[in-house]
Amino acid sequence: MVLVVAGFDPSGGAGIIQDVKVLSALGVKTHAVISALTVQNENRVFSVNFRDWEEMRKEIEVLTPPRVIKVGLSAPETVKRLREMFPDSAIVWNVVLESSSGFGFQDPEEVKKFVEYADYVILNSEEAKKLGEYNNFIVTGGHEKGNTVKVKYRDFVFEIPRVPGEFHGTGCAFSSAVSGFLAMSYPVEEAIRSAMELLKKILERSSGVVETEKLLRDWYRYDTLNTLDEILPEFLEIGHLTVPEVGQNVSYALPWAKNEFEVGKFPGRIRLKEGKAVAVSCASFKDRSHTARMAVTMMRYHPHMRCVVNVRYEREYVERAKKRGLKVFHYDRSKEPKEVQEKEGQSMVWMIEQAIAELKSPPDVIYDEGWWGKEAMIRVFGRNPKEVLEKIKLMVRE
């Protein structure tokens, strides 16, 4: 477990918010106590107010003793107080002498008095020049020029490719990552190396500020595909009743999807082979798909409706859907404007827009009875594949 004692940055790019984001991304249990209140945004610090130790102590002493303590913007004597409270905990102190905009937080001479109480002191190369050389310093070179970033600890020099750009909150993110890996029993050298690799991944996804939360998008991508692969056998089980001649797809969009390549689906579709449904491939974000484009279009109006499946048209399916309370829209392809018919993929967009305009709410089912060169089709919409599957079962089972 890691105890974070750090300042509050209202912009969320640095400080205790960033610390908790990084540690959460690592799956490390975290307790947090605010040590300083700042007035700042991503570009400038206006003021800082350090909290009284006695107030902080009352909050800290009721918590579980931590394995690692990460100290951010705090009165320097806080490090000594924490060492007295937790003699067996590793303390990682991210020294912040001044902001990138030039706001002075701490006096270097005052900081020097308390360096010995931390196991590791993380600071940038400019700050290290002001404080001198200490055996427990981990010095970052992000402020220096070059195509790589170097981090120095004792006789070790770690190097990693630089991510272009200026980012608010890199010091907090890096020191929190080091703390997290130490809490997982990494040797300090490996904690530094792993923290550098993690920060690089975060910065590659960030713009202007350290956006650790975007790592969650990687989990969403995994979860979306995993959800599709797990539920596939259930779709195959009823596939003999649902798969149309053109094949079937289960398209499940990421929450922020803007195009079909941000929608999970089954490339090659689900097909019928000797009367039995089979999937050509496992779930992927690759390949193009009409149902994927339909999912993206639906989300423009109803962002929570992220899943759509095409189903073989049977008149009794439509009647059961209506009878069992699903919201059904009949799409008449003969009424499509010429410009819609002539533009590839535009029919799907226009279809959904017409359904929403008439129903005034998200449709469960949109069906059409076919047209020249177009197979009659039912499309079923829902929040996720499980919900769509249940709607399909309502339609196909007597």
UniProtKB/Swiss-Prot annotation:
Q: Name one GO biological process term.
A: thiamine biosynthetic process
The similarity comment for this entry is: In the N-terminal section; belongs to the ThiD family.
**Protein name per UniProt:** Bifunctional thiamine biosynthesis protein ThiDN
Q: Which of UniProt's keywords are assigned here?
A: ATP-binding, Kinase, Multifunctional enzyme, Nucleotide-binding, Thiamine biosynthesis, Transferase
Q: What is its EC number?
A: 2.7.1.49, 2.7.4.7, 2.5.1.3
Spans annotated as Hydroxymethylpyrimidine/phosphomethylpyrimidine kinase: 1-216
List GO terms (cellular component aspect): cytosol
Q: Quickly give the catalysed reaction.
A: 4-amino-5-hydroxymethyl-2-methylpyrimidine + ATP = 4-amino-2-methyl-5-(phosphooxymethyl)pyrimidine + ADP + H(+); 4-amino-2-methyl-5-(phosphooxymethyl)pyrimidine + ATP = 4-amino-2-methyl-5-(diphosphooxymethyl)pyrimidine + ADP; 2-[(2R,5Z)-2-carboxy-4-methylthiazol-5(2H)-ylidene]ethyl phosphate + 4-amino-2-methyl-5-(diphosphooxymethyl)pyrimidine + 2 H(+) = thiamine phosphate + CO2 + diphosphate; 2-(2-carboxy-4-methylthiazol-5-yl)ethyl phosphate + 4-amino-2-methyl-5-(diphosphooxymethyl)pyrimidine + 2 H(+) = thiamine phosphate + CO2 + diphosphate
Enzyme class comes to: transferase
Per the entry, what this protein does is:
Catalyzes the phosphorylation of hydroxymethylpyrimidine phosphate (HMP-P) to HMP-PP, and of HMP to HMP-P.
